């Protein structure tokens, strides 16, 4: 299974390379790239199974996020991991924001990575879903109300302001905020903001259930 790593940190590249080797991926099938141009070329040449990208590699140039988005869309059979460039925050969780895109951080546990990759490999091999690891591969989806509220929340509105604007009780706002935190798997507002911004940058945004 060809694997591509785009990360400027030697330690991370080595760690991911050793990790994938321990899973049976041959060293010759693990490729490091240093920029988006190389990433695009290697994805087209190798049709990788997995791509690891550090957000730091594409947040500093204006059109980079758009190019990453394009690469992800062009390779629906490849599983992309994006590590958030977020300091001093411990986030061990992961979020499927698309069927082939997971947002996480470098604090992710190897056991979690094991489960995510085995679920992906089972899906690729069309093995019985009954023996899947049980991990949820449904992309993160918010209700329309949660989505509207999240936008206000990110714009700096507090619970009372949101309550007034949406004409719902403050208790209901708090309940919706609780649901958003549960779905994004964190109570840390900084992580929530970061996830939303990153998802907006590399996709068309968090899915909204418009039923």
From Swiss-Prot:
One of its GO terms (biological process) is regulation of DNA-templated transcription. Residues 135-200 form the HTH luxR-type domain. It comes from the Bacteria. Pfam families: GerE. Keywords: DNA-binding, Sensory transduction, Transcription, Transcription regulation. Residues 159-178 bind DNA. GO terms for molecular function: DNA binding. HAMAP family: RcsA (MF_00982). This is Transcriptional regulatory protein RcsA. It comes from Pantoea stewartii subsp. stewartii. The gene is rcsA.
